């Protein structure tokens, strides 16, 4: 059996500071913005020459936060309610023989400043600090296949939860809008995807959760109509 080694070419800077609540696929949270910082010796303007002409990129990365758990021959995809098992190669699970992931993201801009090359990304589904091993331009003529079959994931998941904010939090968000544009929209889009494990989606109202997004510990509770954000704590 052959073995290969790869060098990290970059690192992701993302508003998702932990695995919990990261969207399960790219593009689900449109308001999410992040960056890919190229590392030496790949942080050269020449390395991204012409890339600005593409609207989307494939980002190949390492599941660095789950790789110690090893791989599993079968997993429980969230799209199947967390009950049915599928072969790992029939899923996008992180528990793979080689912990490599791929994400299709929007390229919103490129900044080249001295020794820094930064790609501005949209629709991100990667946790902050994710190691990147390659990027490739997305080619619609070859990679957009409307006739393709996708088993249990044929259709895009729909935002399934109504998200509201207490009066106090709504006022706090208004005050933060200048420094954190679209913060309210971002929080609402993330929580609307319902980040809870599938087995907890029938919980009674009152159960509380928290997640770090950007510089805030966002706390919300389950209500009869969805989720209500009741606290926004700074680090």
What are the functions of these language-model segments?
Residues 119-153:
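Flexible glycine-rich active-site/ligand-binding loops centered on an Asp-His dyad
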Residues 114-124, 229-230:
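Short, solvent-exposed secondary-structure boundary/capping segments
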Residues 1-45, 51-53, 140-190:
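Arg/Lys-rich, positively charged N-terminal/basic patches that mediate binding to nucleic acids
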Residues 17, 109-116, 225:
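Short, conserved beta-turn/loop elements at beta-strand boundaries and strand-helix junctions
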């Amino acid at each position: 059996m052959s073995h290969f080694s790869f060098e990290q070419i970059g690192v992701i800077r993302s508003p998702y500071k932990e695995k919990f609540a990261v969207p399960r696929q790219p593009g689900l949270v449109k308001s999410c913005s992040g960056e890919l910082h190229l590392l030496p010796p790949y942080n050269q303007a020449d390395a991204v020459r012409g890339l600005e002409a593409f609207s989307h990129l494939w980002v190949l990365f390492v599941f660095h936060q789950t790789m110690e758990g090893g791989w599993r021959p079968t997993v429980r995809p969230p799209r199947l309610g967390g009950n049915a098992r599928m072969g790992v190669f029939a899923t996008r699970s992180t528990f793979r023989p080689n912990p490599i992931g791929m994400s299709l993201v929007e390229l919103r801009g490129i900044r080249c400043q001295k020794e820094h090359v930064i790609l501005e990304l949209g629709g991100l589904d990667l946790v902050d600090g994710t190691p990147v091993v390659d990027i490739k331009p997305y080619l619609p003529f070859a990679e957009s296949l409307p006739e393709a079959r996708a088993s249990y994931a044929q259709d895009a998941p729909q935002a399934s939860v109504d998200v509201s904010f207490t009066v106090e939090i709504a006022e706090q968000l208004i005050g933060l809008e200048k420094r954190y544009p679209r913060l309210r929209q971002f929080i609402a889009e993330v929580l609307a995807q319902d980040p809870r494990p599938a087995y907890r989606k029938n919980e009674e109202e009152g159960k509380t959760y928290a997640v770090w997004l950007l510089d805030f510990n966002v706390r919300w509770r389950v209500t009869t109509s969805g989720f209500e954000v009741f606290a926004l704590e700074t680090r």
